[in-house]
Amino acid sequence: MNNFMAKVAAINDVINTFVWVKIGIVLLLGAGLVMTVCTRFFQVSFIGHWFKQTLGSLLKKDSEATRKTDKKSISAFQSLCTALAATVGTGNIAGVSAAIVIGGPGAVLWMWVAAFLGMMTKYSEIVLGMFYRRRNADGEWSGGSMYFLRDGLGKKRGLKTVSAVLAVLFALFAILASFGIGNMGQVNKITLNLQSAFFKNVSAELLGVPAVNLVIGLVLMVLTALIVIGGLQRIASFAEKVVPVMAILYIIGGIVIVCMNITAVGDVFASIFKFAFGIKAVAGGAAGVAIAQVITQGCKRGMFSNEAGLGSSVMVHASANTKEPVKQGMWGIFEVFFDTIVVCTMTALVVLCSGFIDLSTGLPAVANLNDATLISQIFGQAFGFVGEAFIAIAMFLFAFTTVVGWSQYGTKAVEYLFGTTGVKVYKVIFVLMIMSGAVMTSSLAWDISDTFNGLMMIPNLIGVVALCPLVAKITKNYIAREIKGEKIEPMVSYNPEEK
């Protein structure tokens, strides 16, 4: 078993290095910059408008954002919560901790940069996903990168075959990613944190595997099956109730920790900018961190968290009953803002003001720092067992909702490749894979997730950038109609019957 895992790790390392170090970061930041310029910095130019259309709309009675129009679709708010269920996961806690431990405080700045540019990548993905969506055999909306790759990019001269191949590759990588970022990586963090908080003294093993891991894996399999079998409606209903509560409670807990260390906040922000371009080696001690490592960690963990560039959440946003692609796209901007600028930043502040990171050197102040349980240690240091238990429960909710949300992404990818008949088989495999995450080593589960992220990102961003003129045209059309009040024909679908 150990030899097999070693071979898997070696193969994954080769692919991961190529995808992320060679091309991934450049492609991710480059695409975000292109779409930001293409939409004329929409996330800044119309910041008041998209806040009003998203967060502001939730304050209205009988808002369009929370209203469902039919049994086969979900509301815009439900689509946001389902997307946030998939994005607000272990990446917001363990992922940010890992970025800081490996890349230093400066990784936080690059996480922000990736989020700023990622807002428009996410927006563009959703706009295209909404524009090229269609009803499936069961009457449900189906949309995603595979559809705009095939039907959008495929309309360009000489690209029909290439676009069809890219669409299939995206769907295939999405299925694999659903087992990585959406399953094994999340379950692994749940297991580690529950062990750390509640089962420190349990050492029983079964077949060479800790019995606690097997029990946790089994319980998670049952819980996931109960929700996933109910399809999108049950997933959306679950997400709508759980996501807002879990996020608010975690933010409140983070604010309390930061307030307890309020005198360190100034030094925290100073260290973020000071070490954004690398960390010099300490004389007679620890090695430094190269700028490439800082940027890579910040961007990688940022994208792992908000998933801008993956094209993943498009598959659930496209199920919303909203007609306007731009209106749903603005929920994507808010999704990245809330996930990274709010939740991930809160985690970063908690880690950096805790004393576990030396703000004068940018390096860990404690030897052999475990990023997987770092936040748990910090809360435990402040509140004892209650703090550790709080983070274990928060991690469970964050990660479990991600598993549930990603099951829907994988479902839509399977539907594209094999039709609705293949969905049941996929759901069974997805539930069974949970056990692998419970018994796998932390680093390997995380590395495999990184690799699948990158592979999924490549065809998606090729399609987004290639269709940049269409995104700009749809955005310009919306601004003219909804903001400037011009009476022109709306651009809401490639299919005339859906207009």
Predicted regions and their residues:
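Transmembrane helix-loop junctions in multi-pass membrane proteins
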Residues: K7-V8, C38-Q43, G91-V96, S178-T191, ...
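Flexible loop linkers connecting adjacent transmembrane helices
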Residues: F42-I74, A98-V108, W112, M120-T161, ...
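Helix-loop-helix module between adjacent transmembrane segments
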Residues: V34-T36, A114-G139, R150-N188, S196-I227, ...
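Extracellular/periplasmic helix-exit of transmembrane alpha-helices
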Residues: Y123-R133, I255-S271, I279-A286, S319-A320, ...
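Alpha-helical membrane segments and immediately flanking helix-loop junctions
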Residues: D62-I100, F131-L153, L169-I175, G288-F337
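Selective recognition of specific alpha-helical transmembrane segments in multi-pass small-molecule
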Residues: L117-E125, G217-L232, V243-T263, T296, ...
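N-terminal alpha-helical transmembrane segments of multi-pass membrane transport
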Residues: M1-T90, I100-A107, G118, C259, ...
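Membrane-interface loop-to-helix entry segments
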Residues: L27-K52, L166, M184-L194, V212-F273, ...
